[in-house]
Amino acid sequence: MIPIVAVVGATGTGKSGLSLDIADRLRAQGRVAEIVNADAMQLYRGMDIGTAKLPEAARRDVPHHMLDVLDVTAEATVAGYQGEARRVITGILGRGAVPILVGGSGLYVSSVLFDYEFPGTDPEIRQRLERELAETGPGMLHRRLRELDPAAAQRIGAHNGRRLVRALEVVEITGPQPERASAEPRPWHPARILALTLPREELVPRLDARVSGMWADGLVDEVAGLLPAGLADGVTASRAIGYAQAARQLAGELTEEEAMEETRALTRRYARRQVSWFGRYADAVRLDARDERLLEHALDALPAARP
């Protein structure tokens, strides 16, 4: 059985480059690989610079899926992503190709790799919790979630209001989960997880340079072009790191340096959460992103890459 290859890790660790190198090596062996995006913000059309989305010319003729599938006004949901990504992967496997799942959005990755089930939604509960978030802030919601579902509270953290609302909505629908296991559930399909790592003292300068590069490459102009398309009204897209700050810069609420510094701080915080999330993958093969023989070590871990 062909396994899913998952390339995961924090922002700035080189996931896209490694996934393309693996696909190239498989192609040299007569195997076909196709890449499936697992970065929530790369789902959006037009959000390219701030998400480090690979342009077509840089994709080395490797098929890419789950990119540019949503308008900025649409809400990205893990449940919706899970169904579509699994449909795509099933098609890749049916063609005898190797699916390479690539991304840093931890819950999106886990929703594909593991046997996650997502409860439905209740608009009345959601609206009530969103009003409470607007009135009291995320701290109160996080304290309540910590009592009702400690594992979810630890996973989400105290500042992600949107995810806190969703977690509390699920608790109200399904009941409290005080003893829910924090371990990953059963695999959906055989997979080999490659987790890229970097020491924090080397990752942080990469992240800071990445933010500077986003502004230099035209992120503010990209955001200016997306605002008429409804970016400010997008439940998910409007909150994307970098995009929210660039929009506030355009509105005169932040200077350029303030917008960049806020983006740097949020990017560092997000990277810490990514490291924590992927650190829970007990079966992952940990790979040092600085290793000169990174590709060889990655291929050694992949049954699909053996001639």
From Swiss-Prot:
| Enzyme Commission code(s) on record | 2.5.1.75
Biological processes, Gene Ontology terms: tRNA modification
Q: Where on this chain does substrate bind?
A: 11-16
**Which residues does the record give as ATP binding sites?**
9-16
Cofactor(s) of this protein: Mg(2+)
For this UniProt entry, the molecular function terms from Gene Ontology, in alphabetical order, are: ATP binding; tRNA dimethylallyltransferase activity
Lineage, top-rank taxon, reads Bacteria
Residue runs in coiled coils: none
Catalytic function, reaction form: adenosine(37) in tRNA + dimethylallyl diphosphate = N(6)-dimethylallyladenosine(37) in tRNA + diphosphate
Keyword Phosphoprotein in the entry? The reply is: no
Q: Where is this site: Interaction with substrate tRNA?
A: 105, 126
Q: Which UniProt keywords apply?
A: ATP-binding, Magnesium, Nucleotide-binding, Transferase, tRNA processing
Q: Which family does it belong to?
A: Belongs to the IPP transferase family.
Its biological function? Catalyzes the transfer of a dimethylallyl group onto the adenine at position 37 in tRNAs that read codons beginning with uridine, leading to the formation of N6-(dimethylallyl)adenosine (i(6)A).
Q: Which HAMAP family match?
A: IPP_trans
* Subunit-structure text: Monomer.
Q: What is this protein called?
A: tRNA dimethylallyltransferase
Lineage, opening ranks: Bacteria, Bacillati, Actinomycetota, Actinomycetes, Micrococcales
